[in-house]
Amino acid sequence: LLNEIENSTSRISDLVRAIKEYTYMDQTPVQNVDIVKSLETTLTIMNHKLKRGVVVQRDYQRVPLLVNSFGSELNQVWTNIIDNAIDAMSGKGELRVRTYRDDDCVVVEIGDNGPGIPDDIKAHIFEPFFTTKRVGEGTGLGLDTTLRIVKKHRGNIQVSSKPGDTRFQVWLPLAEKQAEERDSPAVRAQQ
């Protein structure tokens, strides 16, 4: 019984820590965010949906990838994409999370082995209020919000999909590239 109490206390402590990290409570709103830490915090928060049959495959670049951003907003991006992937797989399957550097950007790739997104639907997934979920199960705002947040951070998002392999790729400028651009003579002249 004592062991069970200790384990439960540890899990609660981990969840509280993850919630504080997820919301960036007690932190400045804009900061250099470690993308892998951000993804891991989101996965911890979503563990209740993942533990029912979703296997998470991680492939993270070893070098920290920092993005100057509103951290809680990026967590919302990961939440929306991961939640949709879990729903697409009906709660059972493989979720793949990958990070890598591409020139001056970090790329986050989130994929699943669900049924895929038909082309006629894929053309509309980023539109506000577009949903394929039943009434009461979705608002159709998740991917619209995701797109707006990514664009706010001067990034890009793309999706490729076929049965068994749907991938969302998010490109975000690395923190050092953002600093260089912000300090460039052309940007200073506009200010």
Where are these predicted regions, by residue range?
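A short, conserved loop immediately preceding a beta-strand within the C-terminal catalytic
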Residues: 27, 62-68, 72
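Short beta-strand/loop element within the Bergerat-fold HATPase_c
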Residues: 92-104
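Short alpha-helical Gxxx[C/S/T] motif in the catalytic ATP-binding
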Residues: 142, 146
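Detector for a conserved hydrophobic position within an alpha-helical segment of the HATPase_c
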Residues: 149-151
